Design a protein with these regions (language model features):
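N-terminal "arm"/small-domain region of PLP-dependent enzymes with the aminotransferase-like
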Residues: 1-38, 43
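Generic structural signal for small/hydrophobic residues in well-ordered secondary structure
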Residues: 14, 30, 52, 70, ...
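Glycine-/small-residue-rich active-site loops that bind phosphorylated ligands and cofactors
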Residues: 18, 40, 92, 115-116, ...
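Solvent-exposed, non-membrane alpha-helical residues enriched in polar/charged side chains
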Residues: 27, 31, 49-53, 72-76, ...
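Extended hydrophobic secondary-structure segments
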Residues: 87-97, 107-125
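Active-site phosphate-binding strand-loop segment of PLP-dependent enzymes
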Residues: 115-179
Length: 179
């Protein structure tokens, strides 16, 4: 009788690798925040916002608890809520759809472009040109940049703009990715 070979485990990710590589800096920043007593809106948060904005080439950045809150705040800032629909890609984290539902809007899932797994601009154009019956107006489009793979933003912006919809890029999984 042959013994079964032990299973081969292929590691998919090492979430701790980034921390280990930056351990001293991260631990020092956490210690400074804890020592200051300012866990929210303190110097460390302000420094992070300034550094992140500079890294992105933006004038400002606002730190929030998570990507869901960020998307919900942007949607609210655009006045999007009940009576509106928001298109996003079908291949995304639940957080993207949760943000749309948090503001009372209706999520509309757009199929992927098979090569990139990001929003298919042609599918978006088809839905915007011929929305399903009874769907509220699509007031915003949220393409999601996944795994460092940017969506076809220029084409999505043109398509959404032609239909009066704002574009909100969900970059929570692709900070620093380039088109």
């Amino acid at each position: 009788m042959n013994a079964a070979a032990p299973p081969v485990i292929v590691p998919q990710a090492d979430p701790g690798a980034s921390y280990r590589a930056q351990k001293a800096a991260i631990d020092a920043a956490v210690a400074r925040a804890l020592d200051s007593g300012w866990y929210i809106l303190g110097k460390e948060g302000a420094a992070f916002e300034a550094e992140f904005a500079a890294w992105q080439g933006a004038r400002r950045a606002v730190g929030v608890a998570n990507g869901t809150d960020a998307l919900a705040l942007i949607l609210r800032g655009l006045g999007i809520g009940p009576g509106a629909a928001v298109a996003t890609v079908s291949h995304t984290a639940v957080a993207t759809v949760a943000a749309i539902e948090m503001v009372g809007a209706v999520p509309v899932l757009i199929d992927i472009e098979p090569r990139t797994y990001t929003m298919d601009p042609a599918e978006l154009a088809a839905v915007l040109a011929n929305p399903p019956p009874g769907l509220p107006p699509i007031r915003a489009v949220i393409p999601v940049h996944l795994y460092g793979q940017p969506a076809a933003v220029a084409e999505i912006i043109r398509t959404a703009g032609a239909h009066g919809a704002a574009v909100i890029e969900d970059c929570s999984q692709s900070h620093g990715a380039l088109i």
